[in-house]
């Protein structure tokens, strides 16, 4: 979502707004307080997530770690809503239907992805690329998007299809996870209270 213009951004590729840059700097400061040395940053193929990641790395003074970009971590594709103003969408299709498309697990906008379909590309990538690094005791940052992260959190936290509609991930709000040797979540904490 493009906050500046209240647009469904999806796969469109704008940069960060000044608010987005400030949120990334704040997120970096919060992550820096953990005192963790990171091994790798995973991000999407979209510039706003890449910029968020590089701003965070600068804030934690770890600019030299490996950065891996992959479209599997891209935001959800919004189809016919892509690039449209949220209020215009509500006028055209009705507020309730637009809200259902945004939050539902199995219903998506016309021509767009459902959250389930977003997860169908995010989770294999996580399991094939990110999870093995975690199992090697590496510290990873993932700088991605609201819906790609919702898909990942649904898996990690075992959130039901029904409860995922309530999960909201604020922009610029880092979440710290620790995993045991079996890859199960043993600790989770939002760094923004």
What residue ranges belong to the model's regions?
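Amphipathic, non-transmembrane alpha-helical scaffold segments
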Residues: 17, 21, 42, 46, ...
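Residue-level preference for the first positions of well-ordered beta-strands
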Residues: 137-143
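Short glycine/proline- and acidic residue-enriched helix-loop micro-motifs
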Residues: 97-117
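Phosphate-coordination/substrate-recognition cap region in phosphate-metabolizing enzymes
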Residues: 25-99, 154-178
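Short glycine-enriched, charge-decorated loop/helix-capping segments at active-site entrances
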Residues: 6-15, 84-86, 115
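Short, small-residue-biased leader/transition segments that mark boundaries at the very start
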Residues: 1-3
């Amino acid at each position: 979502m493009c906050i500046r213009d209240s647009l469904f951004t999806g796969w469109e590729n704008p940069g960060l707004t000044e608010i987005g840059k400030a949120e990334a700097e704040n997120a970096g400061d919060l992550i820096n307080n953990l005192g963790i040395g990171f091994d790798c940053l995973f991000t999407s193929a979209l510039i706003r997530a890449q910029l968020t990641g590089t701003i965070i790395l600068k804030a934690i003074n770890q600019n030299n770690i490996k950065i891996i970009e992959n479209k599997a971590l891209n935001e959800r594709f919004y189809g016919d809503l892509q690039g449209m103003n949220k209020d215009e969408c509500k006028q055209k299709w009705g507020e309730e239907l637009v809200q259902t498309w945004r939050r539902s697990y199995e219903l998506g906008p016309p021509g767009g992805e459902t959250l389930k379909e977003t997860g169908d590309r995010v989770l294999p990538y996580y399991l094939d690329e990110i999870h093995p690094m975690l199992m090697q005791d590496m510290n990873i940052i993932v700088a991605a998007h609201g819906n790609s992260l919702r898909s990942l959190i649904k898996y990690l936290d075992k959130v039901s299809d029904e409860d995922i509609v309530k999960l909201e991930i604020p922009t610029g709000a880092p979440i710290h996870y620790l995993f045991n040797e079996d890859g199960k979540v043993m600790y989770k904490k939002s760094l923004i209270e």
